[in-house]
């Protein structure tokens, strides 16, 4: 498992794709940058990437539960389990956001190209976007690991954090993940058993979020 570390890039996902094309990115190898100049999030949004936070891309195995299904949600559980093993307990907001004590602390973005699956991961270690930098309809404020877990100072450093998290991700059994991801996702789901409103274009629906189904 190799971590390719660089000071600055446009996007760690782009660097990972380049390494992949060169045959230099094996399963669970990753890229970490101190700063991204064009980090991207869900739906093509810009991911604010100041120095001091974690910006990584990791190649995932295309086997087990990663063969099919809601891959972003499966990886969110995979990452959440790795963080839990380090004492960082998070929730999942459907299906790309990581939440700590009511604030968004990170996000993921999966890309499947060239027969490989790569996960982009961003975690706010010490800095979070100002409210005016977030989209107008954001559902949660942004927060940081430093604010949410003040006693976990060892993980405020993004390189030390990724050293630990990447090792934990690689250590999770794919057989265990395949058997347990859905149940873990149900229990980690933010706003479970609460009233939520879903907006899809002009359509607005309100109901109680009771859980998830495999499909």
Label each PLM-derived region with a short phrase.
Residues 1-84, 88:
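N-terminal lobe of the biotin/lipoate ligase/transferase fold
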């Amino acid at each position: 498992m190799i971590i390719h570390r660089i000071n600055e890039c446009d996007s760690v996902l782009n660097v990972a794709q380049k390494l992949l094309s060169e045959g230099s990115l094996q399963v669970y190898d990753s890229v970490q940058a101190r700063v991204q100049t064009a980090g991207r999030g869900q739906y093509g949004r810009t991911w604010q990437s100041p120095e001091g936070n974690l910006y990584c891309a990791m190649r995932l195995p295309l086997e087990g539960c990663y063969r099919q299904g809601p891959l972003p949600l499966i990886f969110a559980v995979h990452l959440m389990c790795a963080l839990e093993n380090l004492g960082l307990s998070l929730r999942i907001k459907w299906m790309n956001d990581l939440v700590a004590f009511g604030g968004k602390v990170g996000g993921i973005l999966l890309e499947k190209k060239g027969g490989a699956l790569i996960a982009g991961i961003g975690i706010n270690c010490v800095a979070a976007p100002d409210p005016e930098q977030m989209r107008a309809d954001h559902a949660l404020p942004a927060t940081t690991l430093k604010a949410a877990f003040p006693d976990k100072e060892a993980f405020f450093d993004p390189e030390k954090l990724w050293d630990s998290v990447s090792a934990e991700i690689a250590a999770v059994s794919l057989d265990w993940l395949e058997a347990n991801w859905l149940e873990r996702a149900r229990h980690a789901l933010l706003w479970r058993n609460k009233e939520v409103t879903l907006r899809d274009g002009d359509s607005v629906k309100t109901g109680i979020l009771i859980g998830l189904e495999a499909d």
